[in-house]
From Swiss-Prot:
Protein name stated in the entry: NADH-quinone oxidoreductase subunit K
Subcellular location: Cell inner membrane
Function summary: NDH-1 shuttles electrons from NADH, via FMN and iron-sulfur (Fe-S) centers, to quinones in the respiratory chain. The immediate electron acceptor for the enzyme in this species is believed to be ubiquinone. Couples the redox reaction to proton translocation (for every two electrons transferred, four hydrogen ions are translocated across the cytoplasmic membrane), and thus conserves the redox energy in a proton gradient.
Keyword list, A-Z: Cell inner membrane, Cell membrane, Membrane, NAD, Quinone, Translocase, Transmembrane, Transmembrane helix, Transport, Ubiquinone
Predominant subcellular localization, coarse grouping: membrane
GO molecular function, one term: quinone binding
Organism: Acinetobacter baylyi (strain ATCC 33305 / BD413 / ADP1)
Gene3D superfamilies: 1.10.287.3510
Catalytic activity: a quinone + NADH + 5 H(+)(in) = a quinol + NAD(+) + 4 H(+)(out)
Family annotation (Pfam families): Oxidored_q2
Length: 102
């Protein structure tokens, strides 16, 4: 099997990042916003792995492990916040919760 060209991989990473960014900006549900952030982090990790494989450096894989660890921590903290948010407001709509504050 041949290697994936850098341009093709970066196009996929850019599309994934754009989809995640779109999800963060458009969706108002806190859970979907959290999933969109995860997609954006995975797109960045994909770009690091591709760059590391093109230049035959292990730095891309090291950054992938770091981003994966950061994404796991962000998911745990984010889900805890989502649970508290739901218990307090009984919905996950970010705009409605900001209006309740006054």
């Amino acid at each position: 099997m041949g290697n994936i060209p850098l341009e093709h991989g970066l196009i996929v990473a850019t599309i994934l990042f754009a989809l995640g960014f779109y999800g963060v900006m458009v969706r108002r549900n806190l859970l979907f916003m959290l999933m969109s952030l995860e997609i954006m982090m995975n797109a960045a990790a994909l770009a690091f792995v591709l760059a590391g494989s093109v230049w035959a450096q292990p730095d891309g894989q090291i950054m992938f492990i770091l981003i994966l660890t950061l994404a796991a921590a962000e998911a745990c903290i984010g889900l805890a916040i989502v649970l508290q948010f739901y218990h307090r407001f009984h919905h996950l709509d970010v705009d409605a919760a900001s209006e309740m504050r006054g």
